[in-house]
């Protein structure tokens, strides 16, 4: 303890005035069952308002000819709904006596005008809609690649992001690849793979179909299948429908 302070001079508390907002429940009649039902309805409207809320029970508006109120029962109902009774306001002798018996403070009747306090219903916020997914990036479109010389066996020619046009013959063992369509304006004896990145609308156009293999978006036919087609060796186009390659005459 500081030598400059003694138990008689060192203050351990202060009394201060304060304006606190206290909810007042003004009872109009002695009907605890109706009060319980109506409080439950109020709690359903705004449950956060009724959460350990300090309360003054105003009994000074009860008719004088009504019987004594069950004050402990009234406080239990209030406590059940989240209202904590701090004191009562009363003018009837029986109500004041009931409060004194349970050591509950009694305030004098109020002459001030009080406005009804209605808890605002809680607004339930609707969840924000999920943002729309961004559109898939547009495939990079490049100019058509044009090959004017014969394509020999073992060569591989790829048209990235576009179509491939070959104006000469394609030998066995040669391979043509394109992200788009393939056009061969000569004998097609090698392999032609169009739409290799999944473009199911790609097509293959051949002046003379004698290919080792044709493929669109991963669906293919090899030479053994193509030879059985009546259009073998003629001018055809190859398209994809579902997972079936269709060969039709040009």
Swiss-Prot record:
SUPFAM superfamilies: Cell-division inhibitor MinC, C-terminal domain. Pfam families: MinC_C, MinC_N. Keywords: Cell cycle, Cell division, Septation. Residues 112-128 have a biased composition (Basic and acidic residues). Residues 110-143 are annotated as: Disordered. Cell division inhibitor that blocks the formation of polar Z ring septums. Rapidly oscillates between the poles of the cell to destabilize FtsZ filaments that have formed before they mature into polar Z rings. Prevents FtsZ polymerization. Belongs to the MinC family. This is Probable septum site-determining protein MinC. It comes from Pseudomonas putida (strain ATCC 47054 / DSM 6125 / CFBP 8728 / NCIMB 11950 / KT2440).
